[in-house]
Protein backbone atom coordinates (compact mmCIF):
# COMPACT_ATOMS: atom_id res chain seq x y z
CA UNK A 1 0.00 0.00 0.00
CA UNK A 2 1.37 3.43 -0.92
CA UNK A 3 1.71 6.17 1.66
CA UNK A 4 -1.07 8.14 -0.09
CA UNK A 5 -3.40 5.14 -0.02
CA UNK A 6 -2.64 4.61 3.66
CA UNK A 7 -3.53 8.22 4.45
CA UNK A 8 -6.78 7.93 2.49
CA UNK A 9 -7.68 4.76 4.40
CA UNK A 10 -6.90 6.43 7.72
CA UNK A 11 -8.94 9.49 6.77
CA UNK A 12 -11.92 7.31 5.87
CA UNK A 13 -11.69 5.53 9.22
CA UNK A 14 -11.64 8.86 11.05
CA UNK A 15 -14.58 10.20 9.03
CA UNK A 16 -16.60 7.05 9.61
CA UNK A 17 -15.79 7.13 13.31
CA UNK A 18 -16.87 10.74 13.58
CA UNK A 19 -20.08 10.01 11.68
CA UNK A 20 -20.89 7.20 14.09
CA UNK A 21 -20.16 9.46 17.07
CA UNK A 22 -22.43 12.16 15.69
CA UNK A 23 -25.59 10.04 15.57
CA UNK A 24 -28.11 11.88 17.72
CA UNK A 25 -31.20 9.89 18.50
CA UNK A 26 -33.15 8.46 21.41
CA UNK A 27 -33.24 5.13 19.57
CA UNK A 28 -30.56 2.73 20.85
CA UNK A 29 -30.51 0.88 17.52
CA UNK A 30 -29.67 4.06 15.60
CA UNK A 31 -26.83 4.69 18.02
CA UNK A 32 -25.59 1.14 17.61
CA UNK A 33 -26.17 0.29 21.28
CA UNK A 34 -27.42 -3.20 22.08
CA UNK A 35 -30.32 -3.47 24.53
CA UNK A 36 -28.23 -5.98 26.46
CA UNK A 37 -26.07 -3.06 27.63
CA UNK A 38 -28.91 -1.82 29.83
CA UNK A 39 -29.36 -0.96 32.58
CA UNK A 40 -26.13 0.96 32.74
CA UNK A 41 -24.47 3.50 34.99
CA UNK A 42 -22.87 6.61 33.47
CA UNK A 43 -20.29 8.40 35.59
CA UNK A 44 -20.85 12.16 35.38
CA UNK A 45 -18.32 13.36 37.98
CA UNK A 46 -16.76 12.14 41.20
CA UNK A 47 -19.64 10.57 43.17
CA UNK A 48 -22.26 11.65 40.61
CA UNK A 49 -23.88 9.12 38.28
CA UNK A 50 -26.62 8.80 35.73
CA UNK A 51 -28.58 5.57 35.38
CA UNK A 52 -30.12 4.58 32.05
CA UNK A 53 -32.70 1.80 31.77
CA UNK A 54 -34.77 0.75 28.77
CA UNK A 55 -38.55 1.03 28.92
CA UNK A 56 -41.25 0.37 26.37
CA UNK A 57 -41.32 1.10 23.49
CA UNK A 58 -37.54 0.90 23.52
CA UNK A 59 -35.96 4.10 24.84
CA UNK A 60 -34.33 5.14 28.10
CA UNK A 61 -35.66 6.36 31.40
CA UNK A 62 -32.88 8.21 33.21
CA UNK A 63 -32.32 8.47 36.95
CA UNK A 64 -29.58 10.28 38.88
CA UNK A 65 -27.77 9.26 42.03
CA UNK A 66 -25.24 11.16 44.11
CA UNK A 67 -23.00 9.63 46.77
CA UNK A 68 -21.94 11.59 49.84
CA UNK A 69 -20.34 10.63 53.14
CA UNK A 70 -23.76 10.57 54.80
CA UNK A 71 -25.59 8.52 52.19
CA UNK A 72 -26.97 8.43 48.68
CA UNK A 73 -29.49 10.72 46.99
CA UNK A 74 -31.60 9.39 44.12
CA UNK A 75 -33.55 11.58 41.72
CA UNK A 76 -36.36 9.76 39.88
CA UNK A 77 -36.90 6.03 40.03
CA UNK A 78 -38.00 3.65 37.33
CA UNK A 79 -41.35 2.50 36.01
CA UNK A 80 -41.98 -0.64 38.06
CA UNK A 81 -41.01 -2.16 41.41
CA UNK A 82 -38.78 -4.68 39.62
CA UNK A 83 -36.97 -1.97 37.63
CA UNK A 84 -36.47 0.22 40.70
CA UNK A 85 -35.24 -2.76 42.73
CA UNK A 86 -32.68 -3.45 39.99
CA UNK A 87 -31.63 0.21 40.06
CA UNK A 88 -31.04 0.06 43.82
CA UNK A 89 -29.01 -3.12 43.39
CA UNK A 90 -26.88 -1.41 40.73
CA UNK A 91 -26.37 1.60 43.01
CA UNK A 92 -25.04 -0.75 45.69
CA UNK A 93 -22.28 -1.82 43.29
CA UNK A 94 -21.04 1.78 43.50
CA UNK A 95 -21.75 2.51 47.17
CA UNK A 96 -23.05 0.47 50.08
CA UNK A 97 -24.11 3.61 51.93
CA UNK A 98 -27.85 3.87 52.55
CA UNK A 99 -30.15 5.63 50.09
CA UNK A 100 -31.43 8.42 52.31
CA UNK A 101 -32.94 11.01 49.96
CA UNK A 102 -35.27 10.73 46.99
CA UNK A 103 -36.21 13.63 44.70
CA UNK A 104 -39.48 13.36 42.77
CA UNK A 105 -38.31 15.01 39.57
CA UNK A 106 -41.44 13.82 37.76
CA UNK A 107 -44.63 12.51 39.33
CA UNK A 108 -45.40 10.32 36.30
CA UNK A 109 -45.59 6.58 36.76
CA UNK A 110 -42.63 5.79 34.53
CA UNK A 111 -40.51 7.47 37.21
CA UNK A 112 -42.49 6.71 40.39
CA UNK A 113 -44.25 3.36 39.95
CA UNK A 114 -41.40 1.50 41.61
CA UNK A 115 -41.12 3.71 44.68
CA UNK A 116 -42.51 0.99 46.94
CA UNK A 117 -39.02 -0.54 46.72
CA UNK A 118 -37.37 2.51 48.31
CA UNK A 119 -36.21 2.30 51.94
CA UNK A 120 -39.09 2.94 54.32
CA UNK A 121 -37.25 5.70 56.16
CA UNK A 122 -36.20 7.59 53.03
CA UNK A 123 -36.69 11.34 52.94
CA UNK A 124 -38.71 12.57 49.97
CA UNK A 125 -38.27 15.95 48.32
CA UNK A 126 -41.34 16.71 46.23
CA UNK A 127 -43.12 19.79 44.89
CA UNK A 128 -46.59 20.43 46.37
CA UNK A 129 -48.24 20.04 42.95
CA UNK A 130 -46.59 16.67 42.39
CA UNK A 131 -47.49 15.50 45.88
CA UNK A 132 -51.13 16.43 45.21
CA UNK A 133 -50.99 14.47 41.95
CA UNK A 134 -49.61 11.43 43.74
CA UNK A 135 -52.43 11.65 46.28
CA UNK A 136 -54.91 11.59 43.38
CA UNK A 137 -53.06 8.73 41.72
CA UNK A 138 -53.06 6.74 44.96
CA UNK A 139 -56.81 7.12 45.36
CA UNK A 140 -57.41 6.15 41.74
CA UNK A 141 -55.11 3.13 41.98
CA UNK A 142 -56.85 1.87 45.10
CA UNK A 143 -60.23 1.82 43.35
CA UNK A 144 -59.30 0.73 39.85
CA UNK A 145 -57.23 -2.43 40.25
CA UNK A 146 -57.85 -5.32 37.91
CA UNK A 147 -60.20 -8.02 39.08
CA UNK A 148 -58.37 -10.58 41.18
CA UNK A 149 -55.17 -8.52 41.37
CA UNK A 150 -53.93 -6.22 44.12
CA UNK A 151 -54.17 -2.50 43.34
CA UNK A 152 -51.09 -0.65 42.14
CA UNK A 153 -49.21 0.93 45.03
CA UNK A 154 -48.57 4.66 44.74
CA UNK A 155 -46.22 6.04 47.37
CA UNK A 156 -47.25 9.50 48.60
CA UNK A 157 -44.49 11.52 50.29
CA UNK A 158 -45.55 12.73 53.74
CA UNK A 159 -44.66 16.39 53.15
CA UNK A 160 -43.84 18.69 50.24
CA UNK A 161 -41.28 21.44 49.73
CA UNK A 162 -42.14 24.81 51.23
CA UNK A 163 -40.09 26.86 48.74
CA UNK A 164 -38.67 26.63 45.23
CA UNK A 165 -35.20 25.61 46.43
CA UNK A 166 -33.91 23.10 48.95
CA UNK A 167 -30.21 22.53 49.59
CA UNK A 168 -29.05 19.14 50.83
CA UNK A 169 -25.59 18.43 52.23
CA UNK A 170 -24.85 14.77 51.56
CA UNK A 171 -21.47 15.01 53.26
CA UNK A 172 -18.71 16.36 51.06
CA UNK A 173 -21.09 17.12 48.21
CA UNK A 174 -24.03 19.51 48.05
CA UNK A 175 -27.08 19.48 45.81
CA UNK A 176 -29.77 22.08 45.21
CA UNK A 177 -33.25 20.82 44.43
CA UNK A 178 -34.91 23.46 42.25
CA UNK A 179 -38.35 24.27 40.93
CA UNK A 180 -37.82 26.47 37.87
CA UNK A 181 -41.49 26.51 36.87
CA UNK A 182 -44.15 24.33 35.29
CA UNK A 183 -42.93 22.32 32.32
CA UNK A 184 -43.64 18.64 31.59
CA UNK A 185 -45.82 18.59 34.72
CA UNK A 186 -46.95 21.16 37.24
CA UNK A 187 -44.26 20.20 39.73
CA UNK A 188 -41.06 19.37 37.84
CA UNK A 189 -38.01 19.38 40.11
CA UNK A 190 -34.38 19.51 39.02
CA UNK A 191 -31.21 18.56 40.85
CA UNK A 192 -28.29 20.98 40.53
CA UNK A 193 -24.75 20.29 41.65
CA UNK A 194 -23.13 23.74 41.74
CA UNK A 195 -19.54 22.54 42.21
CA UNK A 196 -19.79 19.96 39.44
CA UNK A 197 -22.00 22.22 37.29
CA UNK A 198 -24.41 19.38 36.49
CA UNK A 199 -28.17 19.82 36.18
CA UNK A 200 -30.48 16.80 36.16
CA UNK A 201 -33.66 18.08 34.52
CA UNK A 202 -35.86 14.99 34.75
CA UNK A 203 -38.70 15.10 32.20
CA UNK A 204 -38.29 18.81 31.58
CA UNK A 205 -35.59 17.68 29.11
CA UNK A 206 -36.40 14.87 26.69
CA UNK A 207 -33.36 14.24 24.52
CA UNK A 208 -34.48 13.63 20.91
CA UNK A 209 -37.91 12.57 22.15
CA UNK A 210 -40.98 14.30 20.68
CA UNK A 211 -42.32 16.74 23.31
CA UNK A 212 -44.63 14.69 25.53
CA UNK A 213 -47.40 16.96 26.77
CA UNK A 214 -49.95 14.81 28.60
CA UNK A 215 -49.61 16.96 31.73
CA UNK A 216 -47.55 19.79 30.26
CA UNK A 217 -47.76 23.57 30.27
CA UNK A 218 -46.46 24.27 26.75
CA UNK A 219 -45.65 27.98 26.97
CA UNK A 220 -44.28 27.75 30.51
CA UNK A 221 -42.07 24.83 29.51
CA UNK A 222 -39.97 26.82 27.04
CA UNK A 223 -39.40 29.49 29.70
CA UNK A 224 -38.19 26.83 32.14
CA UNK A 225 -35.64 25.62 29.60
CA UNK A 226 -34.47 29.22 29.13
CA UNK A 227 -33.89 29.47 32.90
CA UNK A 228 -31.92 26.23 32.86
CA UNK A 229 -29.79 27.41 29.94
CA UNK A 230 -28.99 30.63 31.81
CA UNK A 231 -27.55 28.70 34.77
CA UNK A 232 -23.87 27.94 35.36
CA UNK A 233 -24.11 24.40 33.99
CA UNK A 234 -21.70 22.39 31.85
CA UNK A 235 -23.75 19.18 31.63
CA UNK A 236 -27.51 18.82 31.31
CA UNK A 237 -28.98 15.39 32.06
CA UNK A 238 -32.37 14.42 30.56
CA UNK A 239 -35.17 12.32 32.00
CA UNK A 240 -35.51 10.36 28.73
CA UNK A 241 -33.12 9.87 25.86
CA UNK A 242 -29.40 9.43 26.25
CA UNK A 243 -27.02 11.17 28.61
CA UNK A 244 -24.65 13.23 26.45
CA UNK A 245 -21.17 14.63 26.86
CA UNK A 246 -21.19 18.21 28.25
CA UNK A 247 -21.08 20.25 25.02
CA UNK A 248 -23.55 18.00 23.25
CA UNK A 249 -25.89 18.02 26.25
CA UNK A 250 -26.33 21.77 25.91
CA UNK A 251 -26.73 21.59 22.14
CA UNK A 252 -29.39 18.91 22.50
CA UNK A 253 -31.26 20.85 25.19
CA UNK A 254 -31.39 23.79 22.78
CA UNK A 255 -32.62 21.44 20.06
CA UNK A 256 -35.32 20.15 22.38
CA UNK A 257 -36.40 23.73 23.07
CA UNK A 258 -36.64 24.30 19.31
CA UNK A 259 -38.80 21.18 19.02
CA UNK A 260 -41.04 22.26 21.88
CA UNK A 261 -41.56 25.74 20.43
CA UNK A 262 -42.15 24.38 16.91
CA UNK A 263 -44.67 21.76 18.03
CA UNK A 264 -46.54 24.31 20.14
CA UNK A 265 -46.56 26.84 17.28
CA UNK A 266 -47.86 24.26 14.80
CA UNK A 267 -50.69 23.28 17.13
CA UNK A 268 -51.56 26.95 17.61
CA UNK A 269 -51.56 27.49 13.84
CA UNK A 270 -53.96 24.61 13.32
CA UNK A 271 -56.20 25.88 16.09
CA UNK A 272 -56.21 29.29 14.44
CA UNK A 273 -57.45 27.66 11.23
CA UNK A 274 -60.45 26.36 13.14
CA UNK A 275 -59.52 22.70 12.76
CA UNK A 276 -60.83 20.13 15.19
CA UNK A 277 -58.25 18.18 17.16
CA UNK A 278 -58.83 15.14 14.95
CA UNK A 279 -58.37 17.12 11.73
CA UNK A 280 -55.38 18.93 13.18
CA UNK A 281 -53.60 15.63 13.79
CA UNK A 282 -54.04 14.75 10.12
CA UNK A 283 -52.99 18.18 8.85
CA UNK A 284 -50.03 18.80 11.14
CA UNK A 285 -46.58 19.40 9.67
CA UNK A 286 -44.00 18.58 12.31
CA UNK A 287 -41.01 19.14 10.03
CA UNK A 288 -37.89 17.31 11.24
CA UNK A 289 -39.54 16.41 14.54
CA UNK A 290 -41.82 13.88 12.85
CA UNK A 291 -38.87 11.48 13.01
CA UNK A 292 -38.15 11.98 16.70
CA UNK A 293 -38.87 9.13 19.07
CA UNK A 294 -42.54 8.79 20.11
CA UNK A 295 -43.78 11.25 17.48
CA UNK A 296 -46.44 8.77 16.36
CA UNK A 297 -47.72 8.46 19.94
CA UNK A 298 -47.27 11.99 21.26
CA UNK A 299 -48.28 14.26 18.37
CA UNK A 300 -52.02 13.95 18.98
CA UNK A 301 -51.49 14.43 22.71
CA UNK A 302 -49.52 17.62 22.06
CA UNK A 303 -52.31 19.02 19.91
CA UNK A 304 -54.89 18.22 22.56
CA UNK A 305 -52.84 19.89 25.28
CA UNK A 306 -52.16 23.06 23.28
CA UNK A 307 -55.85 23.26 22.38
CA UNK A 308 -56.66 22.91 26.09
CA UNK A 309 -54.29 25.77 26.85
CA UNK A 310 -55.77 28.02 24.16
CA UNK A 311 -59.33 27.24 25.19
CA UNK A 312 -58.78 27.92 28.88
CA UNK A 313 -58.90 24.37 30.20
CA UNK A 314 -55.42 24.69 31.72
CA UNK A 315 -54.96 27.05 34.63
Task: Describe each region flagged by the PLM.
Residues 89-167:
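Active-site HxH/HxHxD metal-binding segment of metal-dependent hydrolases
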Residues 272-315:
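C-terminal regulatory/interaction regions
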